[in-house]
Amino acid sequence: MKAADEPAYLTVGTDVSAKYRGAFCEAKIKTVKRLVKVKVLLKQDNTTQLVQDDQVKGPLRVGAIVETRTSDGSFQEAIISKLTDASWYTVVFDDGDERTLRRTSLCLKGERHFAESETLDQLPLTNPEHFGTPVIAKKTNRGRRSSLPVTEDEKEEESSEEEDEDKRRLNDELLGKVVSVVSATERTEWYPALVISPSCNDDITVKKDQCLVRSFIDSKFYSIARKDIKEVDILNLPESELSTKPGLQKASIFLKTRVVPDNWKMDISEILESSSSDDEDGPAEENDEEKEKEAKKTEEEVPEEELDPEERDNFLQQLYKFMEDRGTPINKPPVLGYKDLNLFKLFRLVYHQGGCDNIDSGAVWKQIYMDLGIPILNSAASYNVKTAYRKYLYGFEEYCRSANIQFRTVHHHEPKVKEEKKDLEESMEEALKLDQEMPLTEVKSEPEENIDSNSESEREEIELKSPRGRRRIARDVNSIKKEIEEEKTEDKLKDNDTENKDVDDDYETAEKKENELLLGRKNTPKQKEKKIKKQEDSDKDSDEEEEKSQEREETESKCDSEGEEDEEDMEPCLTGTKVKVKYGRGKTQKIYEASIKSTEIDDGEVLYLVHYYGWNVRYDEWVKADRIIWPLDKGGPKKKQKKKAKNKEDSEKDEKRDEERQKSKRGRPPLKSTLSSNMPYGLSKTANSEGKSDSCSSDSETEDALEKNLINEELSLKDELEKNENLNDDKLDEENPKISAHILKENDRTQMQPLETLKLEVGENEQIVQIFGNKMEKTEEVKKEAEKSPKGKGRRSKTKDLSLEIIKISSFGQNEAGSEPHIEAHSLELSSLDNKNFSSATEDEIDQCVKEKKLKRKILGQSSPEKKIRIENGMEMTNTVSQERTSDCIGSEGMKNLNFEQHFERENEGMPSLIAESNQCIQQLTSERFDSPAEETVNIPLKEDEDAMPLIGPETLVCHEVDLDDLDEKDKTSIEDVAVESSESNSLVSIPPALPPVVQHNFSVASPLTLSQDESRSVKSESDITIEVDSIAEESQEGLCERESANGFETNVASGTCSIIVQERESREKGQKRPSDGNSGLMAKKQKRTPKRTSAAAKNEKNGTGQSSDSEDLPVLDNSSKCTPVKHLNVSKPQKLARSPARISPHIKDGEKDKHREKHPNSSPRTYKWSFQLNELDNMNSTERISFLQEKLQEIRKYYMSLKSEVATIDRRRKRLKKKDREVSHAGASMSSASSDTGMSPSSSSPPQNVLAVECR
C-alpha cells in the first residue's frame, strides 16, 4: 500500500490503517522487524545489486545517491533504483487485537484505501474464493518485478541470461565443496565455507566470476569472488589445525557424515513459536503412522519405512534457519487453501516428481496439491501450490541439491540427489519411474493430512496393488523389518482386546491415536504409552455400559434442558470443524468451504453457526444439518461427539476414583480443580436469594429424564460407597433436577418469574430446614452427587448440581433471617467456585467459611426482614448506599444474574487462573470478615469480575457510581457494570461507628469502626492498581461500544446515580470526602424516563439511594435537573453482579447516613463524557448552552442507535424462547406491573422483563 511519498519503512507508533478480515481498520504499529531490500545501480560498472538497508549509507529514497557495501567489503557509490519494504509490522487495533502484517497490508492513516464505488455489503455472496472486486483497485501489477515498464529487448536479454545462469549453476564444479575463503578485511585470514548454488538466494546477486558460499562460522550467505576461494582438503588436515581454526571442525564433520552444523539449524522451539500450527503437525504425524500400520496390515506389500518425526523436525530446523539467514524468515505458519501447509510433505512430493524445475505440467502440480490433502477450491490450485513451493522451498531445494544434503524419508531408497544433476531427459525419465512409486511413499508420509484420508487411502490402496517387481528386491530386508513391527502392533492390540472386550478395534485405534496426540513430539518411551493405554482401557471397561445407556437417553430426551446440555457437549467437538455448506437453491446452489463456530438446539433441531472462508463475518449464518456436507473422517457430528464424550468420561472416571480414595481417607471428597469452569454459570442462576429458580410444569419431563440418568448411573457404578451415599442423597436428588432444569430454562429465557420463585422458595426452605441440621454432611453429599451426575452431559451438569445444592443449603433460613442468608448463599457460592479451581487442600478453608457463615447467620438472624423496605429519605443515598443496596439487590439479583452469566460464561471458561487468584483472595476475605471487625473488607465474589481482574485487597470497599445521564446506556449489558465495578472497587470508604455489626454478603462490612483517612489512602493505592485491568476487561466485552470502553463508568446499569460518577475517582484520591446533603438526590436523575425502566432504574438507583421505594423516587426526580455531582462512599456496585444476593445490609439508620455526610463534607468534581458540572452551563450564554446540550444529545443518540441494533438481535432470540414460556411470562408481567403501581420495594418485586431491560433496552 506504499505511495510514492511514504517512507521506506514505518516506525513504531505510526498510525496506520491495517487490513483485518478484508477491511481496513485503524491501528497503531507496536513493533517492527525491519527488513528493507534496496536495489542499487553501481555507478562504477553500471551493474545492479540487491542489498539490505544496513548495507547502504545515505537516504533511503528512490533516486537517492548512496554508498553501498559490495561483496568484497568496499563501499561504492550507487543510485537507489527500487526499495522494497519486507519488514514485519505488529499492529494493535483499537480493540486491543494484534496482528503481524507486511507493509502491503498497511497504509498510512488518511490514505484512500477502498474503492468508493462499492461497499462490501453490496457484494453478492456468490463465490467467496473468486472475490472479484478488490478492496482497492490501485495495485495493478502484482508481479515481483519492479512496476516500471519493461521493454521487449530487456525481456529477451533477461531470459537468455537466466538460461546461461541455469547452465552455470548446474555445471559449476565447485558446488558442494568445502573451500577456504580469504577474508575481505585481512588478507591473511580465511574461513571455511560451503559453495552452494546461486539460485539459493535471489536477493544476493552472484556475478559470473563469483560464487555463493555459506560460512561455517556464522551460517550467513556471501557472494565471493572466485579468486578469493581455494578448495581445502579438510579430511587430510591435521587434528591440531582442525581444533584451532573456528569452523573447521564443523566442516570436517559435515564432509564425513553430511550432518549440518548446529548453527545451520534453528531451535525447534523457535519454529513452534513462529508457527503454532507446527505443533499440531507433530502429533498428526504420529497419528498417520498408526494409519500407515493399519494400511500395512491390509496391504502386505507396503515396504516403506516408518515416517520419521525427528527427520521432519531436522528438515524444518534447517529450512527455517536457511530462510532466516537469507533474509526471508518464515514468521507465520505457511497456509495453502485455508489449511496449514506441510512443507516437509510438499518438499518430498516435489522431490519425487524430479524437483521443481522438472515439473512442467500444471496437472502434476495439481496432483501434488491433492496429495497434500488440501481440498481444491478453484482452478488456481496448481498455480498456488507452485508459488508456495517457490516461495518457501525452491531455494532450499537448490541448496540441498548443491550441498548434497539429504533427508531420510525424502531421499530414502530413492536415487541420490546428485543424480538430479543429470541432463533433463534423464531426470524426466526418473520422474516417470518415481511417479509410479509416489503413492507408496505417500502412505508413509502423511505427517499432517488426515482430512481427506478416506478418499486418499482408497486411492492409495488401488495404486498399491499395481505390480512393483523391479523395486521389490531392493526392499526385501525392509519388508522383513516391517513384518516384525506389524507383529508387535498386533500383540499390542491383542493385549488391549483381552482387557477391553466391549470396545471394538476402531475405537481402540482411535484411543491410541489420542494417546499419540497427547504424547506429541515428546517421543515418550513405549512403556509409558502402554501404561496409559492400559489405564484408559480398564476405565473404559467399567464405563462402557453406562455410556451406552446414557447415550440412548440423551437421544431420547428432547427436553429443553437436555437439548441445551447436548448442545454444550457438541460445541467443543464441532467448533472449528471445517465443513462444506450448501448455499442457495436449485440451479444457483453452490457449495462453500466453511467452519462451524457454534451449535444450538431449536425445537429439538440442531442448528450450526457457520463462517464461510474468505467472507466477512457478516455472512455467518445459522444453518440446519441438512445443508452441511461433513468431511469424510467426521462422518457427521455424532461419531465425533461420542468419541469425545467417551474420552471425557474416561478422564472423569479417573478423577472419581481418586476422589473415592480420598473420601475413604478423609471422609469428605475433595472437589477437584477439574470441576468445569462453567461453575459460575450454574451457581449464579441460583445464587440470588429471591429469584432462586422457578418451577414450571414444562420442567417435569426434564426432571424425569435427569433422575433417570442419575439412577442409571448409580446402577452402573457398582461401588458400595456410592450406593450407601445414594440413600442420603435421595432428597437432594429430587431437588437437584428441578433446579438444574430451571436453570437451563433460565439460560434460554433470560427471564425470571418472581411469583414462581417465591412459591418455590417457600417450599424449598421447608425441605431445607430439615436438611439444615447436618449442613456439612450435605455439602459433602452434594459434591459427591455432582460427581455422580450424568457424565454424558459433560461437566456442565456436574457443576450445576453442585452449585444448586450448595445454594440450596445457603438459602436456608432466608425467611427467618432477613438479609443474612444472602451472605451465606454468597459465600457458599464462593466456596464452590473455589472448589472449582483448587484442589482439595482449599476445601478445608471453604469448610471453615461455611462454619463461620453459620455463626454469622445466628448473629444476623435477629434483624427483622421488614427493615429491608424501610427507607427514611430517598435522597440520602450517599454513604449508606452500600448497606442499603442489599435489600434491593435481593430482588434485582435474579435478573442481573442471568445477564451476567450469559455474557461471562464464556469468559470464565477462558480464565481459570485469574479466577483461582481471586478465589484465594475471597477465601482470605471471608475468614477476615470474622477476624477483623475493625476493617471493612470488600469481598467481591462476582465470578465475572474475577475473570476480568485479580481480586482487590481485602480492605478495599467498592465505591460505585454511575452516570445515568445517558439512560440509553442502561441498555448495555451488565457486563460493563462488572468491569466498572471492579475498577471502582479501588475507592475505599469508611463506615461510621454507628453501623450495626452487619456482615455484608459481599463486602463483609463487619466493622462498626471507621478506618482512618491514612488507612483508606494506603488501601486505595493498593486497589488502584486494578483499574487498568478492569478497563481492559471491559473493552473486551462483546457488547461494548467504543465509547463505553473508553469510559468504563458510563454504562453502569445499576448505577445508583447520575453524576456521582463525576467525583468517583477524585474523591478516591482526596480521601473519600462527602458532598453536602442537598446533592444526594441528584443521583436519580432521569430515573424514570420510561415505565419499563422504572423498576429497573429505581432498583438500580435505589441501590444507591437508600432503598427508597418507587413512590419516593418522585421527589428524587425533582432534583435531577440540578445534576450536581454527588459522591456516595459506600456504594458497592455488586448488586448487579450475578451472584450476590445480599450485597448490603439493609439495617442502616438515617442518623448514620447523616454522620457519614458530616464526616466527608466535600468532594471535588470530575467530568465524564455525558455528565457535566452545572457551573459549566452557568458560564455559557443561552445559545452556547443549547448547542452544547444538542451536541450531547447527538452523541447519546448515536450511542442509542448502536444499542438498538444489539437489542434487535437479542429480541430475535427471545422471540423463539417466548413461545415456550408465554404463560409464565404473563404471570411475571402482571407481577411487575403490580409492583410498579403499588410502589413495592424492588426487593420484593423484581419484574422478570427487566432482565433484558437491564441488559440492553
Curated annotation (Swiss-Prot):
A biological process from GO: erythrocyte development
Modification Phosphoserine occurs at: S676, S716, S864, S1109, S1145
Keyword check for Nucleus: yes
Annotated ranges, domain Tudor-knot: 576-628
Transcription as UniProt keyword: yes
Molecular function in Gene Ontology: DNA binding; transcription cis-regulatory region binding
UniProt xrefs under CDD domains: ARID_ARID4A, CBD_RBP1_like, Tudor_ARID4_rpt2, Tudor_ARID4A_rpt1
Segments of skewed composition (Low complexity): 1226-1248
Biased composition (Basic and acidic residues): 290-300, 416-436, 485-501, 549-561, 647-662, 705-749, 775-790, 1063-1076
GO cellular component: nucleoplasm; nucleus; plasma membrane; Sin3-type complex; transcription repressor complex
Superkingdom of origin organism: Eukaryota
Glycyl lysine isopeptide (Lys-Gly) (interchain with G-Cter in SUMO2) crosslink, residue number(s): K481, K513, K718, K738, K759
Compositionally biased spans, kind Acidic residues: 151-165, 276-289, 301-310, 538-548, 562-571
Alphabetic keyword roster: Chromatin regulator, Differentiation, DNA-binding, Isopeptide bond, Nucleus, Phosphoprotein, Spermatogenesis, Transcription, Transcription regulation, Ubl conjugation
Residues covered by region (Disordered): 141-168, 271-310, 412-469, 485-579, 632-750, 775-800, 873-893, 1063-1167, 1212-1257
Stretches for region DNA-binding: 4-121
InterPro entries: ARID/SWI1_ChromRemod, ARID4A/B_PWWP, ARID_dom, ARID_dom_sf, CBD_RBP1-like, Chromo-like_dom_sf, Chromo/chromo_shadow_dom, Tudor
Described purpose of this protein according to its UniProt entry: DNA-binding protein which modulates activity of several transcription factors including RB1 (retinoblastoma-associated protein) and AR (androgen receptor). May function as part of an mSin3A repressor complex. Has no intrinsic transcriptional activity. Plays a role in the regulation of epigenetic modifications at the PWS/AS imprinting center near the SNRPN promoter, where it might function as part of a complex with RB1 and ARID4B.
Assembly information from the UniProt record: Identified in mSin3A corepressor complexes together with SIN3A, SIN3B, RBBP4, RBBP7, SAP30, BRMS1, HDAC1 and HDAC2. Interacts with BRMS1. Interacts with RB1. Interacts with ARID4B. Interacts with AR.
Domain comment quoted from the record: The function of the Tudor-knot domain, also named chromodomain-like, is uncertain. One study suggests that it mediates binding to lysine-methylated histone tails, with strongest affinity for H4K20me3 and H3K36me3. However, another study failed to find any interaction between this domain and histone H4K20me3 peptide.
Stated name of the protein: AT-rich interactive domain-containing protein 4A
Gene source species: Homo sapiens (Human)
Lineage, broadest ranks: Eukaryota, Metazoa, Chordata, Craniata, Vertebrata
